[in-house]
């Protein structure tokens, strides 16, 4: 019977045999995997890097700062659950651990970037030089209160309206200074008298 089929229909059988023996990588495979859209590519790469990288993290980019730090009007900034909601929604963490503190700022990126060209002032946590905003900015300070690993992180949310202190770094691709970290959001009533003789804003240790 098999000999008869081979004799009568040699070509179709050869094609079928070739298909069966063809390496898997050359066959068409239908999958349900969804690859990241173009506007999600950086976020996907950042997620992979945080969990699988063993080297130093990449410096922050414009899109990362916009996504993780800058906020739009919506939930009231004085809401008790603001930080818990936003930190989880914006995936603010380092590898699989909670961040000890974080700031959300109600401002545009261009306004934040301009601060990089303001005068230097002292800042907290042993950092010698920060750039300070000229005007007051609304934001939320998030302070870790419970747990150390995601997703159990719990934060205290503190509304602030004050001067933003940031550090900046030079980005070769853009040939510009860009915001690197938010060091503090200093409310003026508490530090109103801390001005040096030349008008430089000074924060006590």
UniProtKB/Swiss-Prot annotation:
It is found in: Secreted. Pfam families: RnaseA (PF00074). Does not exhibit any ribonuclease activity. The keyword Ligase does not apply. InterPro entries: RNaseA, RNaseA-like_dom_sf, RNaseA_domain. One of its GO terms (molecular function) is nucleic acid binding. Keywords: Disulfide bond, Glycoprotein, Secreted, Signal. CDD domains: RNase_A. GO terms for biological process: defense response to Gram-positive bacterium. SUPFAM superfamilies: RNase A-like (SSF54076). Disulfide bonds join 98-153, 116-168, 123-130. Belongs to the pancreatic ribonuclease family. SMART domains: RNAse_Pc. This is Inactive ribonuclease-like protein 9.
């Amino acid at each position: 019977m098999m000999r008869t089929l081979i004799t009568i229909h040699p070509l179709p059988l050869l094609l079928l045999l070739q298909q069966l023996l063809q390496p898997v990588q050359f066959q068409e495979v239908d999958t349900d995997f969804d690859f990241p859209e173009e506007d999600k590519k950086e976020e996907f790469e950042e997620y992979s890097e945080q969990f699988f990288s063993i080297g130093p993290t990449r410096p922050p980019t414009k899109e990362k700062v916009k996504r993780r730090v800058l906020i739009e009007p919506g939930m009231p900034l004085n809401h008790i659950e603001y930080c818990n909601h936003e930190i989880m929604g914006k995936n603010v963490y380092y590898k699989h651990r909670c961040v000890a503190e974080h700031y959300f700022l109600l401002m545009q990126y261009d306004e934040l970037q301009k601060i990089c060209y303001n005068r230097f002032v002292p800042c907290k946590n042993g950092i010698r030089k920060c750039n300070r905003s000229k005007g007051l900015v609304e934001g939320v300070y998030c302070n870790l209160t419970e747990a150390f690993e995601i997703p159990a992180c719990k934060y205290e949310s503190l509304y602030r309206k004050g001067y933003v202190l940031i550090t900046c770094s030079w980005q070769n691709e853009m040939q510009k200074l860009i915001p690197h970290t938010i060091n503090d959001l200093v409310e003026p009533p508490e530090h109103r008298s801390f001005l040096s003789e030349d008008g430089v804003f000074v924060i006590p240790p």
